[in-house]
Amino acid sequence: MRLESVAKFHSPKSPMMSDSPRTTASDSLSGTDVMAAMGMAQSQAGFGMAAFCGKHELSQNDKQKAINYLMQFAHKVSGKYRGVAKLEGNTKAKVLQVLATFAYADYCRSAATPGARCRDCHGTGRAVDIAKTEQWGRVVEKECGRCKGVGYSRMPASAAYRAVTMLIPNLTQPTWSRTVKPLYDALVVQCHKEESIADNILNAVAR
């Protein structure tokens, strides 16, 4: 079972899973099976499960849990980023909270996010390769150049920068780009990594 199945299980319109017992290994998982698998996955990959469940609006509590996990990770690695490492206690904590909140929001974006769908590919992540289409006489697609194949635009890092400058008024754009934004980017990447870990664990425990 994959994480996407968890989202479908929580959808009232999804017929894929039910509480009826399985008759063969290939039958749909029962509600009890799913909840047991989720519990095991949460015990081993709490960050990834919270990140995914919050992303898919399955739980508001999971959203906050994911941000808290991300803040813990940010604090752990902050010493590698000069613009954050030099900050004093309370200011540093607030900056990490801002970075974690915006990074998680970026991770949560999708083609379904209002205003985020790519204007060129309309959320498909694919675009027509005009040169090859003319060469081969049939439609040939390629990765969308605007969104790099994801189907949506990322949250502008400038939004996080503006929020951080409320706490560090003298933070210039160049300094942000060199010494703080790399941490912001690392937090977004970490969310995706943790989701992947949770997905693999869930698949293993629900075989």
Swiss-Prot record:
Molecular functions (GO terms): DNA binding; zinc ion binding
Site annotation Interaction with host RNA polymerase sigma factor RPOD: residues: E134
Keywords: DNA-binding, Host-virus interaction, Metal-binding, Transcription, Transcription regulation, Transcription termination, Zinc, Zinc-finger
Region Disordered: start-end pairs: 1-29
Coiled coil: none
A Pfam family the protein falls into: Antiterm
DNA-binding region: 171-192
Function noted in UniProt: Mediates the switch from middle to viral late gene expression by associating with host RNA polymerase (RNAP) so that the latter can read without pausing and through transcription terminators preceding late genes. Competes with host factor sigma 70 for binding to RPOB, the beta-subunit of host RNAP. To join the elongation complex, binds a specific DNA Q-binding element (QBE) and interacts with RNAP that is paused during early elongation. Participates in the lysis-lysogeny decision by activating the expression of the late lytic genes.
Protein name: Antitermination protein Q
Native source species: Escherichia phage HK022
